[in-house]
Amino acid sequence: MENQNNIHRELTSLPVGKLLWKYSVPAIVGTMVMSLYNVIDRIFIGQGVGADAISGLALTFPIMSLAGAIGMLVGLGASARISIVLGQNDKVKAEKILANSLVLSLSFAVCYLTFFSVYMDDILRSFGGSDRTIPYAREFLIYIMPGMLCTNLCYSFNNMMRASGYPGKAMYTMLLGAFSNLILAPIFIFWLDWGIKGAAIATDIAMAISAAFVMIHFFNPKSQLRFHRRYFKLEWGILFNIVSIGLAPFLVNVASSVINAIINTSLYRYGGDEAIGAFGIFNSYATLVVMLIIGLCQGMQPIVGYNYGAGNYTRMKKAFVLTGIVATICCTVGWIGSTFFPYYIIRAFTTDTNLIDVAIHGMRIVMGVFPIVGFQIVTTNLFQSLGMASKSIFLSLTRQVIFLIPLLLIFPRIYALNGIWIAMPVSDTIATAITLLLLWRTDKKLQNKNSVITR
C-alpha cells in the first residue's frame, strides 16, 4: 500500500519534465534494445556472411514485425489499462489484467508460431524472396522462432512492469538481454562459424534471459503487482479492454509487415535482391529512431493515463506537449544522419559497393520528411493512452495503410524504383496533416472536461 501511495504522489505531483525523464529513459532503453537485436544481427551477418544474407534477413522483417505486433497488442493494451485503473486506486483489477495478459500472450504466441512454421517457404516467396535469398531467411527463422515465446513475454510484461511503477527495473532487464546478445552473436557467427543461425541462437538465449527476469519480478510477493492463481481465470471484459486499446499498435505492426511485404515484392521487381537488401539496411536505421520515439511514448503513457484517470488534465497536456517536442527533435537528428552522413551508416552493414549506392539513394528520399513523423506517432499514442482506441487505430492506419498502399501501387508504374522510395515520405506528409486535424477536433470535443491538449 505504501508503494502504491508513493507511485500516486509521484505521478500526480512530481514535475512533469522530471517524471517524463524518469519513465521515458528506461522505456527508450527497452525499445531501443528490442531494435538493437535486429540491428546487431544485420551488422554481423552483413559483415560476416555477405550481401545475399542481409537481403535474406530483410525478408524476415515482416515476420519479426508480426511477432512484435503480438507483444504490443497485449503489452501496450494491458499497460495502458493498468495505468488507468491504478490512477483510480483499483489494485485488484490491475492484477486481474496482469494475469489475463499472461494467458492471452501465450495463446497468441502459440498460434503465431504454428502458422508460420507450417507456411514458412510460401510466405517468404510471397514477400519477394528469390532462390538466392530464401535459404538464408529460412535458416534464420528456423532457429529464431522457438525463441519468439520468450520475446513475446519479455516485451509484453516489460511494459507492464514500467506501468506498475518499476521503469528502472524494466530498463535493466532489457539491457541484460542486449548485452548477452552483443557478446554471444559474434562468438556464434564468427568463432563457431555458425553464420546466420548463430545470430538467431544468440538472440534466443538473450531473450530467454530477459524473459526469466521479467517473470521473476511478477511472481515476487514484494512487487507492486504480482500474479495470483485466482486471477488467471479469463474475464471477457478485461480481454476486450486489453485488445481494444492494444489494437492500435498491433495494427501498426501488422500494417508494417504487410507494407514491408508489398515493398519487398515491388523492390524485387524494379531493383532485384540489392534493392531489398538496401531497404533492409536503412529501414533498420529508421526503425531505431522510431523505436526511440515509441519508448518516449511508453514513458508518457503512464503519466497521461494515470492523470487522465485521476482527472488531472493539465498534467496530461504538459506530458503530451513535452513528449511531442522531444520526439520532433529526435526525428530531426535522425534525418540529419540520413541526409548528410548516409555512407557511414550504410557502411556499418555492408562493404558491397552496389548495395551501398542503392541504399544511400533510397535512404535520402524515404527519410526526406522524417522530422514530422515523431509528432504523428506521439499523437497516435496519446489517444491510445487515453483509451480512445478508434482514433488511435485510425491514425495508425493512415500513415502505413490508407495512403501508402495506393501510392505504392501507383508511383512505381511511373517512376520505377524511385516511385517506391517517393511513396513513403508522401504518405507521411498526408498522415501528419490528418493527425493535426483530428487532434484539433478532439480537443474541441473535450472542452467540457477542461481539455487543454493543444493549448
Where are the regions a protein language model picked out?
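Membrane-helix interface/capping residues of multi-pass secondary transporters
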Residues: 42, 51-54, 91, 120, ...
